[in-house]
Amino acid sequence: MGADPLPPLEFEWDDNKSQQTFQDRGFDFGFATQAFSDRSGFREPDQRLPYGEDRFRFYGEIQGKLFVVVYTERQGRIRIISTRKANSREIQAHGQRRADAPEA
């Protein structure tokens, strides 16, 4: 028998911020949750400012485009703080990471 599948991730977010993101960028936080399904995605700590909590940036592809999702973990849930399409520097770095990754 194979390994048990991982439990589904649970997400939460501020609905007003999600709606503002939709108005500004054309997609909301619900759409951004798809980035976490990217098996070649990765996360890194977000230490740009002293936020008072651990924050992370997750890089994952949705429909062939790279997205950045900033989030924290609260009570076993992923709380999305912001999301955007990756910039050209991030896209290039992600491509290099994938090229350098060992084959599974």
Regions found by a protein language model. Give the residues of each.
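Ribonuclease/tRNase effector modules and their secretory precursors
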Residues: 1-104
